[in-house]
Amino acid sequence: MAKKKTEIGRAGEAVARKYLEQRGYRVLHINWRYGHYELDIVARLPDLLVVVEVKTRDQRRIMEPEDAVDKAKIRRTVAAADAYVQTFDIDLPVQFDILSLIKRSDG
């Protein structure tokens, strides 16, 4: 089960990356880690740093993917984004997005 969940998550991140790049985002990092925290995708627009949390679910789930982003996850993401900005000395506004994907049964 954990392996399948990881595979679905990684596939979702690949789709999200392609989606963002097609819309003019420059992807800087995928799965950037800070301690136990992780930023799924860090991307850049000309005047904005964008931190993207990617949530991918099997279509059989009852919950919507974005419902998995609770207050604790938001706090961890903000802490990791703060570390990212400090690590790379970035002086841009930061936008936080959730990209929600539902895997179809046909692939």
Label every model-predicted segment:
Residues 34-37:
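Short acidic/glycine-enriched loop/turn segments that link adjacent beta-strands
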